[in-house]
Amino acid sequence: MAVQQNRKTRSKRGMRRSHDALSAPTLSQDKETGTTHRRHHVAPDGFYRGRKVVDV
């Protein structure tokens, strides 16, 4: 079983965890209907960039 050779410092632990933060999803509003959706994703009503792309 692997056991660490030396204890990691608080600084090294913090540097490792610096990339673990979660970010809120970026939201956009549809120009046609004004609904909010994630960027580069189809809106719940099937529109993307002002065009109907999915039949809902």
Swiss-Prot record:
<keyword id="KW-0689">Ribosomal protein</keyword>
<feature type="compositionally biased region" description="Basic residues">
    <location>
        <begin position="7"/>
        <end position="16"/>
    </location>
</feature>
<feature type="region of interest" description="Disordered">
    <location>
        <begin position="1"/>
        <end position="56"/>
    </location>
</feature>
<dbReference type="InterPro" id="IPR044957">
    <property type="entry name" value="Ribosomal_bL32_bact"/>
</dbReference>
<dbReference type="GO" id="GO:0015934">
    <property type="term" value="C:large ribosomal subunit"/>
</dbReference>
<keyword id="KW-0687">Ribonucleoprotein</keyword>
<dbReference type="GO" id="GO:0006412">
    <property type="term" value="P:translation"/>
</dbReference>
<dbReference type="InterPro" id="IPR002677">
    <property type="entry name" value="Ribosomal_bL32"/>
</dbReference>
<protein>
    <recommendedName>
        <fullName>Large ribosomal subunit protein bL32</fullName>
    </recommendedName>
</protein>
<dbReference type="GO" id="GO:0003735">
    <property type="term" value="F:structural constituent of ribosome"/>
</dbReference>
<dbReference type="Pfam" id="PF01783">
    <property type="entry name" value="Ribosomal_L32p"/>
</dbReference>
<dbReference type="InterPro" id="IPR011332">
    <property type="entry name" value="Ribosomal_zn-bd"/>
</dbReference>
<comment type="similarity">
    <text>Belongs to the bacterial ribosomal protein bL32 family.</text>
</comment>
